[in-house]
Amino acid sequence: EIPFLDITKKIEKEVDDFNPNLIITHNPVEVNQDHVITFKAVEVATRPMHSKVKPTIWGCEIPCSGRWTLEKKFIPNVYVEIEDFIDQKLMAWSKYQGEEREFPFPRSEEGLITIAKYRGMESGVKYAEAFRCWREVL
């Protein structure tokens, strides 16, 4: 197990070195605790008083663990149209060995298409990827 402070310091260094304007990370609303720790480390590493860099922070939707929480659910507020990239997304997910099962599993090909269509319906496009904007400095 890696100490939380070590994770945070590594992220701080990468943010300072790379100077990103957007960081996409996990969400705190997850059953996968590694994802929650990742989100918290990014949150700490990019706190406004620490960093000269003020990147926008988005949390991505994980097709499974973000849907299986009992108390809270992932609520997106940013959508990216992916109609031109849906085939590439499916191909990329197919390389994620051991994480795909038959539908109705969310990470099956049919599950991923269903989620993309649902997020598309929410945002008025054919297919969309959903995110949660946690911080943006304009």
Where are these regions (language model features)?
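Metal-dependent de-N-acetylase/amidase catalytic core
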Residues: 1-138
